[in-house]
Amino acid sequence: MTLGNLKPNQSGKVVRVEGQGANKKRLFDMGITPNTIIKVKKRAPLGDPIEIEVRGYVMGIRKEEANKIIVEVQ
């Protein structure tokens, strides 16, 4: 399942981050790495962007990025 499929207040453990290059590095720099727990806080009305909580920080990411983050639902 991808992070983009989680509903608000659902959490998932990152299994892997797909993609390559600058986009993947950016996600890693944001603390989104394997075995990290991510919680979806809320979604914009049309589903993009998604507000998430990672390592105690709240941030927004695009749905396109969220769909590259493979998670295991917690």
What is each model feature region?
Residues 1-2:
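Absolute protein N-terminus
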Residues 17-20:
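A structural micro-motif recognizing beta-strand termini
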